[in-house]
Amino acid sequence: MFTGQEYHSVDSNSNKQKDNNKRGIDDTSKILNNKIPHSVSDTSAAATTTSTMNNSALSRSLDPTDINYSTNMAGVVDQIHDYTTSNRNSLTPQYSIAAGNVNSHDRVVKPSANSNYQQAAYLRQQQQQDQRQQSPSMKTEEESQLYGDILMNSGVVQDMHQNLATHTNLSQLSSTRKSAPNDSTTAPTNASNIANTASVNKQMYFMNMNMNNNPHALNDPSILETLSPFFQPFGVDVAHLPMTNPPIFQSSLPGCDEPIRRRRISISNGQISQLGEDIETLENLHNTQPPPMPNFHNYNGLSQTRNVSNKPVFNQAVPVSSIPQYNAKKVINPTKDSALGDQSVIYSKSQQRNFVNAPSKNTPAESISDLEGMTTFAPTTGGENRGKSALRESHSNPSFTPKSQGSHLNLAANTQGNPIPGTTAWKRARLLERNRIAASKCRQRKKVAQLQLQKEFNEIKDENRILLKKLNYYEKLISKFKKFSKIHLREHEKLNKDSDNNVNGTNSSNKNESMTVDSLKIIEELLMIDSDVTEVDKDTGKIIAIKHEPYSQRFGSDTDDDDIDLKPVEGGKDPDNQSLPNSEKIK
């Protein structure tokens, strides 16, 4: 399939492309200016072809820089090809086309064919050679733009703002990429051009739908670069995974403001409840604490003590103005220097003897040498020259170096009980500090739990007190209603008694009184059965004993409710409930 769209797809800024465009214009002018040779018997066909070439195909723009140049050029070549294929039987043998196969892709143009068609075929061959000489990256861009132009001209992609297929998407379809350029080596008919264009459009349409309409695809390089640090340790390619919320794979980095759970929980120290809690780890707690202040070294006090011990020997201090500068000129006096050197040696030996006789027995030899170097700063007698010589000797003393000074500081730190970082003692002290913090937190949690338990106990105690008050109130209320009911029944009995005396006499009055007492007893026993009360005081009506029996065993007996004797027993107690061990006495 020859469409000529390779002219438009090549970058116009390239010098080689400019030469190709210029050569294309010259070849096109040659094709249009030359006449198609034909025989005398085919004058009608030649006239038809000439009139067809003068139609709309020639009136359109044939400038290679025009966007419609590829379509116009394809129309001109197809018209020439239609003339040669439709009239190959009527032409002379030198202009005929070999008819080997019906398919247009298998038709080969003879060297003695039409010169105009040969020029068009030569133009296509030159174009293919130029494409082979170009770089692979330029070829990929040409092919991607070629497919994009096919989609735009065929109306597959209607939205101009929609992203077309790029060279990265086209690289996945090798068969589609190779099919279109291979068709340009032949001269197919209009029907084959339409069929090939439709097939390419269909393939590109489905490819574009799959690439652009997938909501889970990650084609943005900026997103890939942003997410690559999170998944690089596992070798996960995020371009092949859908983005889900929450993600289907575990990230290698912790979340925002989430501590890394690396601390081991001690279940024997009351820390078992911390396994599922999001609490601050002891590592962070230890690292967030401010560092301890450095140890204070009182060198002035040390020098004062030495001065006091050596007071009878040295009793004059060097003035501040006598301290020399490093850049000052040195005045050498050999006699005085030798004398001062002997005195400094005597002073250092005396200081060494005093330090050895001191009670510090665990001091190493290095600290002694450090103190020997520091003794040269002590005050001496003899004026400014002696002070200068002592300072010179102190600066020239190789024993007093920064290394020895650092060891002296470490020695002072160790004497105060601070272990050196990195040692076993330091690790043990750090572990003990962690355990101390964990134990304090455990005690704090226990204290909070105890306070909560005490609070709940107080609340339940208050509720019980309120319930007891209500119970007493209802007991008194029931006793009052009982008394009121007795009074009411007696009044009713009196009325009945007066009416019955005239008829029956004294026997009827005794009978009515016994019926009233029995009715009250029946009501009381019914209430006791409903409330599982076993004993009630006869005078006050308060509950004395309550029956504690499971609900499933309350009605497990075979006795019927109608067989229960409702008459009271002597003493106001039920014989069935006297032997129950679970009865509770209420005072």
Curated annotation (Swiss-Prot):
Residues 453-467 are annotated as: Leucine-zipper. SUPFAM superfamilies: Leucine zipper domain (SSF57959). The modification Phosphothreonine is found at T559. Residues 16-29, 385-395, 565-576 have a biased composition (Basic and acidic residues). GO terms for cellular component: cytosol; nucleus. InterPro entries: bZIP (IPR004827), bZIP_sf (IPR046347), bZIP_transcription_factors (IPR051027). GO terms for biological process: cellular response to carbon dioxide; cellular response to oleic acid; cellular response to stress; positive regulation of transcription by RNA polymerase II; regulation of transcription by RNA polymerase II. The modification Phosphoserine is found at S171, S179, S399, S557. It is found in: Nucleus. Pfam families: bZIP_1. Residues 396-418, 577-587 have a biased composition (Polar residues). Residues 425-488 form the bZIP domain. One of its GO terms (molecular function) is sequence-specific DNA binding. Residues 39-57, 123-134 have a biased composition (Low complexity). Residues 1-62, 123-144, 169-195, 381-423, 552-587 are annotated as: Disordered. Keywords: DNA-binding, Nucleus, Phosphoprotein, Repressor, Transcription, Transcription regulation. Belongs to the bZIP family. Transcriptional activator of promoters containing ATF/CREB sites. Can independently stimulate transcription through ATF/CREB sites. Important for a variety of biological functions including growth on non-optimal carbon sources. This is ATF/CREB activator 2. It comes from Saccharomyces cerevisiae (strain ATCC 204508 / S288c). The gene is CST6.
